[in-house]
Amino acid sequence: MFYQENFDVIVIGGGHAGTEAALAAARTGQKTLLLTHNIDTLGQMSCNPAIGGIGKGHLVKEVDALGGLMAEAIDHSGIQFRTLNASKGPAVRATRAQADRALYKTYVRSVLENQPNLTLFQQAVDDLIIENDKVIGAVTQMGLKFRAKSVVLTAGTFLGGQIHIGMENFSGGRAGDPSSITLAQRLRDRPFRIDRLKTGTPPRIDARSVDFSNLEAQPGDNPTPVFSFLGNRQQHPQQVNCFITHTNEKTHDVIRKNLDRSPMYAGVIEGIGPRYCPSIEDKVMRFADKDSHQIFIEPEGLTTHELYPNGISTSLPFDVQLQIVRSMKGFENAHIVRPGYAIEYDFFDPRDLKATYETKFIEGLFFAGQINGTTGYEEAAAQGLMAGLNASLFSQGKEGWSPRRDEAYMGVLIDDLSTLGTKEPYRMFTSRAEYRLSLREDNADLRLTEQGRELGLVDDIRWSRFNEKVENIEKERQRLKDIWINPTSENIDQVNSILKTPIVREASGEDLLRRPEVTYSSLMTIEKFGPASDDQQASEQVEIQTKYAGYIQRQRDEIEKSLRHENTKLPFDLEYNKVKGLSNEVVAKLSDAKPESIGIASRISGITPAAISILLVHLKKHGLLKKGK
């Protein structure tokens, strides 16, 4: 039976990728359906109760700059906020917040339920309706069929999900939820390259059984940083401390003695786990020279006693988990509320995706989130927003869009995935971006909001505030350029008091701000250069843009040089074996990857600059040299 209404976009899955995808499609005016196996778990934090971090916080700010939800949701549910790398340069500073799980999920659901153009429906999806290699809908568990022009699949760890606790294992998408077995089987019948990955979660602890007097308190920042460009500190709920403890030699001895009971070390789990978030048994074996590992004790919320011990993810049996937990300082009498576990699941080789997240084999089908081999809420949200946007554009018959590597971490993410693929769960770091000085948290809106407005993602409120901020930046920079001081000026002693070396020639406010020892706030203490701008975001930009102007310009020059042929299109049906001069290896790799552009081709492993030159000559010779947008 077909549902009586047709949709423009169907999103399958209500996690962090699915919610952003559904909201993006709906915000751009498309009639959108979000199918989830359980409406009560929309926006649920399946693993750690936190948003942001190095590289990840940058993605959250970019999602926000394009009108996404994640930053707004954490501002309303964050119970501890911190700026990481605060003493370092702006390129690597990152915001991180602990979340109250219940508040976060409630906020996400409220936004989804009140979003125009968006319909929610609770049913697991068992199959996709595909005709002539084009998706036209989805089939639910009870046989109900939904038609749509495009479909976004955000299945998380649910496709063929298998949960492991010791030698016991059972089917599940996460603890308490069923896995998508039928859909996983159907997708395996398609021409996708599919493999297995694994992730894990630690046991949850009852705070009432912990001796906090033996733990090191870790307070948040004061004043608290804000995630959303439209957010403010008044939105933040009550703030609390996190705590720190450590594993010890006793902990490690327990783990070593029970490795034969670990499904990972016994060969039961074949999927590869996240390199940068390994299980405690993996850490103990890989870093055998370390006597202890730091464990962050994170509260799960304001109205629960559950604690999340970040750093002891494990799939060891429950009795061993209990020994591990109770071996740590402060946890001698700890009670485990929920056991830790590992989960193994299907993922699809992201090299089978276009830069828009559309699959190369099935027209109108988009993948986002852990299905693409990534790990983390933030990576999922970024993919979800882009996939939802491009599914919307596809349903309207418009050309897709994705940012380049030099424009956004979102661009780095899809470029890495679609050109290099991944053999392990991929997480974002600032080190993955070659142009990170230009890709800062603080300028995500300046990089993306204008484009978001053109694409229909940015509403009037955000657009108005953005334009106000841009205007305030320009006005304040010009004001500082116009104020001059010289060695004989009336305020010279006051000026020299904030300088390492006194002024010997005439200088503008901008000249002074360029000096490493001068901050915007210290400059504003001098009467001649005050008062400070009322717009704190604008004044932050004035300082960063002024201090780093030379470096930023140098990076822009590098970007322009590298972009010369970045968007030169490569025909999908180009027969590389007929391009004279290409080696057999290059022909095989290009034929397999079918890159969309010269830029993407150049980043495929083994594709040499000489091969790129040969391709360009071939394109020109046959009248195929076309520049993309």
Swiss-Prot record:
Main location: cytoplasm
Residues where NAD(+) binds: 273-287
Residues making up the signal peptide according to the UniProt record: none
Record: residues binding FAD: G13, G14, G15, H16, A17, G18, V125, S180, Q370
Cellular component GO terms held in the UniProt record: cytosol
Locations listed in the record: Cytoplasm
Record-level GO BP terms: tRNA methylation; tRNA wobble uridine modification
Name of a matching Pfam family: GIDA
Cofactors that this protein relies on: FAD
Residue ranges crossing the lipid bilayer per the database entry: none
UniProt KW keywords: Cytoplasm, FAD, Flavoprotein, NAD, tRNA processing
PANTHER family reported for this sequence: GLUCOSE INHIBITED DIVISION PROTEIN A (PTHR11806), PROTEIN MTO1 HOMOLOG, MITOCHONDRIAL (PTHR11806:SF0)
Name of the featured protein: tRNA uridine 5-carboxymethylaminomethyl modification enzyme MnmG
